[in-house]
Structure formats: C-alpha cells, structure tokens
C-alpha cells in the first residue's frame, strides 16, 4: 500500500509541509489501515474510549464511584519503564555518557526501520499534535506523536495540551519534536486483537541532535506516552543544555505563609520517594497553606529579573497508585475521585471500583492486575502491580495553584534534592552555596524502587533524580548546572536543600512522621531564605537542631527528631568511597567544581575525627 491509497492521509487539517511529509513517510513504512489526525475533542475521546472498551483494553468502572473512569490491565511483561532498552543515540558516544545506553544512530535507525516496516498493519495510525507547557508561552515546545495505540491517544489528551490548538500553533513551518511510537503488533486480515498489544522486542530511542524519539514494542506509559519522560526530560534536557535552561525531574510546590507570602519550591526525588505527596502537601502548621503547580517535571528558565522561573510542562498526573490513600495524600484521592481517570494495573472490586495496596478498606474479594480472582490475606502476591498508575487531569486537583498554567512560570525560591535513605542523610541540610548544592544533587543516592527495572532496596546514585532521564553526558549535565549558577546573580538563585524523610532508627522505625508534617521542615527552609532561622554548621552543610524546627503540636519523641537530624561523621566517612566510586563511573567529564566540593567534604570530615 502506498501513502496515496491509505485513507485519511489526504484530509490533514494542516498545511505544515514538514509534518505532512513525515506522516506520509511513516505511513508508507508502517502500513496502517487508515490515518487519523486527532483534534483532542470530547467527542473524539468518547469514541476512542468506547473502542477501547469494545477491544477489552478498558473496563468501565462504577459510574457513581469513579465517573467516566476506566481500568486497563497490561500484558504482564509490559509494566514499567525499560531502562535496559532505552537509548540515547547521539552522534558521538561520549555525548551519551556512561549513564545511558548508546548505539550509533545510523545503526539504530536501520534496526528500528526494519521493526517499523508493516508494524501498524491492521491498525489505525494516529497523528497526535501536542504542546508541553502552556500554548501561550514565548517559546512553546511542540511535538507530534504518531502512534497505533488508542490507549496512548486518550492518555496523551490527559497528560499534554493535545489536539488542534497545538497543531495550529505549529503554523505551516514551526519546529516540532518528532515522536514515533508503534506497539509492534500488526494484525493480519481477520486476526483477533488482544486487550494489551505489545511486542517482546522493545526499544525506546532518543536522537538528541535531531530532537526525535522512536519507541517500539511497549504500550506502557513511560515508554509510550512520548511527551512524558522521553520529551519532557531526555530530549528537553538536551534542548536546555543548548539553550541555557534546566529541564528537571521535579515537583513544583507553592507554600503560603501566615503573612500570605507565597514561596515556590522545586524538588527532585527519584520515583516513589514521595514527590506527588509533597506536591499535594497539606501543611499541619497553623496558618500555612500549600498549592500544587506540578508533581513530576519542572522546566526552569531565567526571567527578566534574573530569577529562575519554573513551568510544569504537563497537563495531568501519571501517579503511582500503591501507597496513595486518604491519609498519605488526600488531595490525590480527591483528584482521582473527581473521575475522568484511567487506572492501569490496579485491582478491581466486585462493585466496579478500584483498589490497591495501601488504600483504606480491604475487600474480601478482588480481581487482581493480572485479571485473576484474588482473596486478600490468602496470598503474598500483590493485588495491584507495585508500579500501577492513575492518569488524571491536573485541573481536578483541589489544591491547584492559579499560576499552574502561567506561561511565564513561577519564581523558584528553593530547590530540594531528596532520596530514600535509611541512614546517614539528615532530615534536612542546607547547601553552603550554589556549587555545593550542585554537588549535593550530583551525589544523590536512593534505594531502588519498583518504578524501574532492577533489584528493589539497593542504593543507587541518582543525580538530581535524573539518572534514567538524562539526554546527554552526566558530566556535561553537572557542568551545565554549575554554569547556570556562574552566569547568574547568586543572590537571586534558589537556595538548595537536601532532605530525607525516610531515615530509620536502630529498631527500623521511621524517625520522622513525614507527609503533612514535612511542612515543618519546609518552614525552616523558608525561614533560612528569609534569614529568620538558625542552623548549625556541619561537615555536610547547615543542619537545624530540633529547637530550630517548629514542632508545636507534634506528638513525636524528641529523641527521634534529634536522631533524624543527626550528622554522624563516621557514617559519612563510609559514604566517601561510594561517592568516589560514583565519580569514577562518571569519568573524565566530572567537573573540577564537583571534585573540589568532594575534597572539601573529605577535609571537613577529617577535622571532625
């Protein structure tokens, strides 16, 4: 079949020649039955969800409990990002760096072109125009995803500003990121489809110089919703490096003091370390309020006043379900309860609602994420997959900040780095200056979670929580962070803090209650910015004492707070060779400034001996 005979190609609602040529090229290669240009309308979404229900991909949930919401159960082999099959195919291997898989781009294009050949046969090819961040931005970042997955189209409508408005923004010659996705599951005439088509062979490939994404074989969110990690972090980080800004794996939180002064905080935590919970914080300190700007990604650019301004490029939440409940994150629950949500790989109750581990109430009987009968307490397996998700519109969040859609972004007062560490790292530490803050982010370590492949529980270095998402060499990335500070007025730069909500006592208990009580820790950070709070100088930075924190009304053992804030030089001396090992892995591109900070830390720890 030539492109001339594929229905839908001749009715494109655009005169963008570059886009039309690409669509024709992909259609000729992948051989779909038809081509559809998506418009993002309610009618289109309703039509696609009906199709997905008929195909068995979606199960309609109880309309009274979860209005206009659906459950999808994936193939058991397609449940998470596949870091082992994710590539940065820069022209030079050194530009991908040691943290990324690399292949020569010409070789990769050859392999994937062969895989794409005929891969959409029997399916519809959707052309999905989208914008990351507000459409009215000075420099809107546009993209087009071509996909053969209705699940992807529906999810992209939730997660991005998708449809005709984005297409119109491109005009006749505007630049856009090309994002090509195929499930790799062609259908022969008369062949019955499966509810979750995918392929055992998977590639998620990025070409940073040409700003292209090619994904094959997976229908799962992070591998298939190409506006998310692929564009917003991997390709955008390469763009940011070239253009002098930052594309980061960070939530954006608005904290409002009793004096009604607003502070915006960006925070980088690895997956499943409480990012969404903090983004939707409910402060427990009287008079303080919090609002949400974003829960996962922040793009930070300098404003005309010399400060860093952040936008959330996303339009929805793609959150981890297990552990989300009315106690840990009531605002996430309210967002989900409002409806219009797609759940993936959670369990289903007998009355057509959803359930996952950590949710209040334990039904006697469930259908688990594999579609099997499940009796709680009779098995050690999980009813919901540990990386099961909800995909829901950000506009439904009850604590959404009015500035969330501001094309200028919001001015960032503080940047937090944090991971999941049982020992060593105190509840909060303030960096001495910008470069010291970059060192803290560059050496961030966290225990492995279920959001990625690999052994759960082992500590891995996750610089700025960007390890799986860097679009270029990690050493160049650290230098870019240092340069961002060098080229700015440091007095206008955000203060940098290092937090750890997860420290445990010798008996294995969490020392800090976390969740809403984290507002007490953030209050200290804000007061440090305002020069109103004390802290003690330690070898690792400025750390508060228990007396420096507002603990009024908190029922917690004072000894636990002291232990959560403790800086133990002997533990940090054990950390030094692990950092050294990490730097050896980073290799020759490790910036001198980072090495200088490490040497200074060693010196300060030696003085504590």
Swiss-Prot record:
GO terms (BP aspect): cellular response to glucose stimulus; gluconeogenesis; glycerol biosynthetic process from pyruvate; oxaloacetate metabolic process; propionate catabolic process; response to lipid; response to starvation
Compartment(s) where it occurs, according to its Swiss-Prot or TrEMBL record: Cytoplasm
Note accompanying the cofactor annotation: Binds 1 Mn(2+) ion per subunit.
Active site: 273
Gene3D superfamilies the record matches: 3.90.228.20, Phosphoenolpyruvate Carboxykinase, domain 1, Phosphoenolpyruvate Carboxykinase, domain 2
GO molecular function: GTP binding; manganese ion binding; phosphoenolpyruvate carboxykinase (GTP) activity
Record pathway: Carbohydrate biosynthesis; gluconeogenesis
Residues engaged in binding substrate: 81, 220-222, 271, 387-389
Catalytic activity: oxaloacetate + GTP = phosphoenolpyruvate + GDP + CO2
Keywords, ordered alphabetically: Cytoplasm, Decarboxylase, Gluconeogenesis, GTP-binding, Lyase, Manganese, Metal-binding, Nucleotide-binding
EC top class named in words: lyase
Family: Belongs to the phosphoenolpyruvate carboxykinase [GTP] family.
Biological role stated in the UniProt entry: Catalyzes the conversion of oxaloacetate (OAA) to phosphoenolpyruvate (PEP), the rate-limiting step in the metabolic pathway that produces glucose from lactate and other precursors derived from the citric acid cycle.
HAMAP family the record matches: PEPCK_GTP (MF_00452)
Name of the protein described by the UniProt record: Phosphoenolpyruvate carboxykinase [GTP]
Gene: pckG
């Amino acid at each position: 079949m030539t492109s001339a005979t594929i229905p839908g190609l001749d009715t494109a609602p655009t005169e963008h020649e570059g886009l039309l040529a690409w669509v024709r090229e992909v259609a000729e290669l992948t051989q779909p039955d038809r081509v559809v240009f998506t418009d993002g309308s309610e009618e289109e979404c309703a039509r696609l969800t009906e199709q997905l229900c008929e195909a068995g991909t979606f199960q309609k949930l109880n309309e009274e409990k979860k209005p206009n919401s659906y459950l999808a159960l994936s193939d058991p082999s397609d449940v998470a990002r596949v870091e082992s099959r994710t590539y940065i195919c820069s022209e030079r291997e050194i530009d991908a760096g040691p943290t990324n898989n690399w292949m020569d781009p010409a070789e990769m294009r050859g392999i994937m072109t062969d895989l794409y050949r005929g891969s959409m046969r029997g399916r519809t090819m959707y052309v999905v125009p989208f914008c990351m961040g507000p459409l009215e931005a000075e420099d809107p970042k546009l993209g087009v995803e071509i996909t053969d997955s209705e699940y992807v189209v529906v999810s992209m409508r939730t997660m991005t500003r998708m449809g005709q408005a984005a297409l119109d923004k491109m005009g006749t010659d505007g630049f856009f990121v090309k994002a090509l996705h195929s499930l790799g599951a062609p259908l022969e005439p008369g062949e019955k489809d499966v509810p979750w088509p995918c392929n055992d062979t998977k590639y998620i490939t990025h070409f940073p110089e040409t700003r292209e994404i090619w994904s094959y074989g997976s229908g799962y969110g992070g591998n298939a919703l190409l506006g998310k990690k692929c564009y917003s972090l991997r390709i955008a980080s390469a763009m940011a490096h070239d253009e002098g800004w930052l594309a980061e794996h960070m939530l954006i939180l608005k904290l409002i003091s009793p004096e009604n002064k607003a502070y915006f905080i960006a925070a980088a935590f690895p997956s499943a370390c409480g990012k969404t919970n903090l983004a939707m914080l409910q402060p427990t300190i009287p008079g303080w309020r919090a609002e949400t700007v974003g829960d996962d990604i922040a793009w930070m650019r300098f404003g005309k006043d010399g400060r860093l301004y952040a936008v959330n490029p996303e339009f929805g939440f793609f959150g981890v379900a297990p552990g989300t409940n009315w106690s840990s994150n009531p605002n996430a629950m309210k967002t989900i309860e409002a409806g219009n949500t797609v759940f993936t790989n959670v369990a289903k109750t007998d009355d057509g609602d959803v359930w996952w581990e950590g949710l209040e109430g334990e039904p006697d009987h469930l259908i688990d994420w594999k579609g099997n009968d499940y009796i709680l307490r009779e098995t050690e397996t999980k009813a919901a997959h540990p990386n099961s998700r909800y995909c829901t519109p950000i506009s439904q969040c009850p604590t959404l900040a009015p500035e969330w859609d501001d094309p200028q972004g919001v001015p960032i007062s503080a940047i937090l780095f944090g991971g999941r560490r049982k020992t060593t790292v105190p509840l909060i530490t303030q960096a001495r200056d910008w470069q010291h803050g970059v060192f803290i982010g560059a050496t961030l370590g966290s225990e492995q979670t279920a959001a990625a492949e690999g052994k759960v529980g082992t500590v891995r270095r996750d610089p700025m929580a960007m390890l799986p998402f860097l679009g270029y060499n990690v050493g160049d990335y650290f230098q870019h962070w240092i340069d961002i500070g060098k080229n700015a007025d440091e007095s206008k730069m955000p203060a940098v803090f290092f937090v750890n909500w997860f420290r445990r006592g010798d008996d294995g208990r969490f020392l800090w209650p976390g969740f809403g009580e984290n507002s007490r820790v953030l209050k200290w950070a804000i007061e440090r910015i305002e020069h109103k709070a004390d802290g003690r100088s330690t070898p690792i930075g400025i750390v508060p004492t228990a007396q420096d924190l507002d603990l009024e009304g908190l029922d917690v053992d004072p000894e636990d707070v002291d232990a959560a804030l403790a800086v133990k030089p002997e533990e940090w001396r054990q950390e030094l060779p692990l950092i050294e090992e990490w730097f050896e892995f980073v290799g020759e591109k490790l910036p001198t400034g980072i090495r200088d900070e490490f040497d200074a830390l060693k010196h300060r720890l030696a003085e504590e001996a």
